[in-house]
Every structure is written in structure tokens, then in C-alpha cells.
Amino acid sequence: MFCVIYRSVKRDQTYLYVEKKDDFSRVPEELMKSFGAPQLAMVLPLNGRKKLANADIEKVKLALQEQGFYLQVPPPVESLLTTPV
């Protein structure tokens, strides 16, 4: 199984994984609008791979099979301010 990963031009650290290059037919239109014009980041074989850098590989595979895409968003920003206890 392969996936094609695209970078969002509108949202920093946001990536869209699809099964085939330039095939966004299963991605909701509203998501594509907010994602912006996808920029190809890489083509990645998933078979034999045990993990991905910033996504759970099993969730990615399942999402690709069930809905045809996986959206990776950046982790939430933790507050840099500390409150005294």
C-alpha cells in the first residue's frame, strides 16, 4: 500500500494523505477549500513500515481504506506561560 502526501499552503504543518497521486475525489469539498492548493510532499510506501514521524500508521491505513484520505494536523500548542500554584 502506498500513500501520497500533500502539504497545505494555507495551514502550517497540515498534511493530506491520499491513495493515488492527484486523486482528491474522496476528499470533502469543504476540506479541500480550507486546505488550499495541495503541494506534493512525498510518495510513501506503507507496507512493511512500522511507524510514521507524526501520525499513527494504523490510523492512516484505516482512514485511507475507509474514507480515502487522512488529514494530519499539527499538535496543539502548549502554553508557554506558567501560572503560580
UniProtKB/Swiss-Prot annotation:
Signal peptide: none
Highest taxon in the source lineage: Bacteria
Stored InterPro entries: YcgL-like_sf (IPR038068), YcgL_dom (IPR027354)
Ranges of residues in domain YcgL: 1-85
Matching Gene3D superfamilies: YcgL domain
One Pfam match: YcgL
Protein's name in the database: YcgL domain-containing protein ECA2367
Species of origin: Pectobacterium atrosepticum (strain SCRI 1043 / ATCC BAA-672)
